[in-house]
């Protein structure tokens, strides 16, 4: 039932995903203990997250092992574990060359993504992430010619319609290109999401 469409859902990796009745925004907060967010909510310093919790949906996802960005994010976006999607870590050892190879190429992702499945079924999909290495996997098989968008704040100054489905992102967001290792890199993602 891979990628099958029904009137109310899509199927991917043996899971049915209901067709949303209104636009859906997914924010993945990666790399932090949920206790930090919970404390911020108690302290009242995260009003927008509090609104997500109150008016929408929130969950703490079970992490995969090893606990690295690439395998966890690909598990979220494919709805499947590393044994299915193929991204088992941030690097793998090439048996022929003996080199460590970073696992960020979309060709290494063995599963379709939920994003591409919904886009193929007619939904308009926007994928924005901080770092471009992740953007390439998140945007795998996403048809940018049909109004879908996939870009990173890291390369927001380089976006083209052909590669990202959007251009002039810095102008749209109204912020300068953030430094790669700054908190503004993630803030840019959220600001871009609001503008789109």
Predicted regions and their residues:
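Active-site-proximal N-terminal segment of extracellular/periplasmic enzymes that hydrolyze or transfer
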Residues: 3-57
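Generic alpha-helical secondary structure signal
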Residues: 5, 35, 43, 47, ...
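A general structural signal for short secondary-structure junctions and capping/turn motifs
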Residues: 16-18, 50, 66-67, 115-120, ...
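Glycine-rich, histidine-containing beta strand-loop boundary motifs that form or position
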Residues: 29, 63, 127-131
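Glycine-/proline-rich flexible loop or hinge segments
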Residues: 31-35, 54-60, 69-72, 90-103
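Generic alpha-helix structural propensity
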Residues: 32, 44-47, 68-72, 82-83, ...
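Short, structured active-site-proximal loop/turn typified by the sulfatase FGly-forming signature C/S-X-P-X-R
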Residues: 37-79, 124-126
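His/Asp/Glu-rich, glycine-adjacent segments
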Residues: 79-196
């Amino acid at each position: 039932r891979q990628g099958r469409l029904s009137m109310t859902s899509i199927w991917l990796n043996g899971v049915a995903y209901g067709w949303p009745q209104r636009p859906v925004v997914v924010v993945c907060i990666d790399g932090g203990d949920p206790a930090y967010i919970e404390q911020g909510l108690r302290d009242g310093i995260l009003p927008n997250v509090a609104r997500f919790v109150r008016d929408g949906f929130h969950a703490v996802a079970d992490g995969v092992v090893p606990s690295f960005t690439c395998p966890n994010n690909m598990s979220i976006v494919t709805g499947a574990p590393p044994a299915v999607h193929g991204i088992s870590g941030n690097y793998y050892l090439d048996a022929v060359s003996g080199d460590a190879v970073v696992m960020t190429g979309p060709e290494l992702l063995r599963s379709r993504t939920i994003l591409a499945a919904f886009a193929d079924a007619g939904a308009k999909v926007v994928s924005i992430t901080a770092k471009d290495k992740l953007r390439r996997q998140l945007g795998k098989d996403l048809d940018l010619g049909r109004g879908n968008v996939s870009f990173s704040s890291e390369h927001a100054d380089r976006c083209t319609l052909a590669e990202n489905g959007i251009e002039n992102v810095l102008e749209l967001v109204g912020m300068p290109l953030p430094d790669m290792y700054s908190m503004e890199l993630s803030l840019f993602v959220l600001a871009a999401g609001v503008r789109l």
